[in-house]
Each structure stands twice: as structure tokens, then as C-alpha cells.
Design a protein with these regions (language model features):
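Basic nucleic-acid-binding interfaces
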Residues: 1-73
Length: 73
């Protein structure tokens, strides 16, 4: 398994957009993204750098592996 990259929240949102996620809304520093089929909803904090555990949880909710995600960056 690859190491998780150190990225910002906005970079994560752009990468998830490439696999069909769309920004649903934003409240404060949290961006809610949603994909229709298969249904998935993730919340990405708009921070300068995402913690490894936070990024891993986002990927788990999105149904992506670390390798798949790094190819999207």
C-alpha cells in the first residue's frame, strides 16, 4: 500500500471531483461532496493540510484506495 500524500483540503476536493463527486454545500471550513451512483457523501475540511487519519477516513467513505486516489492527484 502506498503512503498517503500530504495535501490540502481543496486538492482533495478537486481529486474527488474527477471521480464524480460534486460540491453539495459548504458550511464554515467544511465542504460536503456527494456522488449519485453509487451513492456516497463525504465531508472534507478546507484546511491547509489534511491529517493522515482524516484523509484515510475520507477515502474510506468515498470507496477509494490510496493508490486510486494518488492517481487522481
Amino acid at each position: 500500500m502506498s503512503k498517503l500524500p500530504v495535501i490540502a483540503g481543496r486538492e482533495c476536493v478537486k481529486a474527488l471531483g474527477r471521480v464524480g463527486f460534486a460540491v453539495r454545500r459548504q458550511q464554515g471550513s467544511h465542504i460536503v461532496l456527494r456522488r449519485g451512483s453509487p451513492f456516497a457523501q463525504v465531508v472534507v475540511p478546507d484546511h491547509r493540510t489534511l491529517d493522515r487519519g482524516t484523509l484515510r477516513a475520507i477515502l474510506r467513505h468515498a470507496g477509494l484506495s490510496v493508490d486510486e486516489f494518488t492517481k487522481l492527484l
